[in-house]
Swiss-Prot record:
Residues 1-38 form a transit peptide. Binds 1 [4Fe-4S] cluster. PANTHER family: FERREDOXIN-THIOREDOXIN REDUCTASE CATALYTIC CHAIN, CHLOROPLASTIC. GO terms for molecular function: 4 iron, 4 sulfur cluster binding; electron transfer activity; ferredoxin-thioredoxin reductase activity; metal ion binding; oxidoreductase activity, acting on iron-sulfur proteins as donors. The active site is at C93. Its cofactor is [4Fe-4S] cluster. Keywords: 4Fe-4S, Chloroplast, Disulfide bond, Iron, Iron-sulfur, Metal-binding, Oxidoreductase, Plastid, Transit peptide. Its EC number is 1.8.7.2. Heterodimer of subunit A (variable subunit) and subunit B (catalytic subunit). Heterodimeric FTR forms a complex with ferredoxin and thioredoxin. The record marks H122 as: Increases the nucleophilicity of the active site Cys. This is Ferredoxin-thioredoxin reductase catalytic chain, chloroplastic. It is found in: Plastid, Chloroplast. It comes from Zea mays (Maize).
Amino acid sequence: MTSTVTTTVGCGGLPVRPLSTATRGRPRRCAVRAQAAGADASNDKSVEVMRKFSEQYARRSNTFFCADKTVTAVVIKGLADHRDTLGAPLCPCRHYDDKAAEVAQGFWNCPCVPMRERKECHCMLFLTPDNDFAGKDQVISFEEIKEATSKF
């Protein structure tokens, strides 16, 4: 007698066996992250927190935002997104094999170690006055960030 086990598509398009045939009798679970109705408000709050942090840190470190405010806006939005999803403002301008491990290590959490030690910001968020791309501003409005990032 032959038995056939049918599969269904699970998380990430991977096949999974039906619950009745799962190994060791435990059902397989898949966490699906969905945006709730209040997700935009939550993200707006994080963007505002990161905006205020960026302005304060720029003043404290005597650095300036990029002359192209779109760069500043995108980086602040990326920091806010990482703060929401990872619990820390991990530098959004780098590739990580394991973001959770990077957050735990803290090296690339904003302000990152190179910024704190040598005033070197890979993201071009905090630029020294002698940098060719440095603007004259240490402030950016929430509206500027929303407008610049609404296209993405």
